[in-house]
Amino acid sequence: MTHRSSRLEVGPVARGDVATIEHAELPPGWVLTTSGRISGVTEPGELSVHYPFPIADLVALDDALTYSSRACQVRFAIYLGDLGRDTAARAREILGKVPTPDNAVLLAVSPNQCAIEVVYGSQVRGRGAESAAPLGVAAASSAFEQGELVDGLISAIRVLSAGIAPG
């Protein structure tokens, strides 16, 4: 696989601390398992899954990934989380786990590290990915600077898609 990476540092988008909780502080119906995971039940009629983003944002993100993948005949994927010390190497490693890594584009974003990486497989090279990658990073960082994480992800995917020719 041949990969290309583009990186642009932006201001922090999100941050947080790891929290610990005592058993007595847990709400009723919640337990601390032996593995350290917190597990709980929900009240009847209440959602049992709490997504990190509003459902409308998740739908918009899914639509951007779906339509971009169809338009370019390339699998688009997003990774959101820590990328470690070598962000480009970690992004390439994550791309390798995508079902079709040779024909995929990964947008990897580490908000706490202020890092954005775009890597792609060998079948995408030569189809415009080289020039689309820095434009996608710029589109993402512009929205991230405004505190708009999901909009930045969607903008980057759309820009990448517009710059990559179908295979």
Swiss-Prot record:
InterPro entries per the UniProt record, alphabetical: DUF5130
List the source organism.
Mycobacterium tuberculosis (strain ATCC 25618 / H37Rv)
Q: Which domain of life is it from?
A: Bacteria
Annotated protein name in UniProt: Uncharacterized protein Rv2468c
Q: Which Pfam families match?
A: DUF5130
**One Gene Ontology cellular component annotation held by this UniProt entry:** plasma membrane
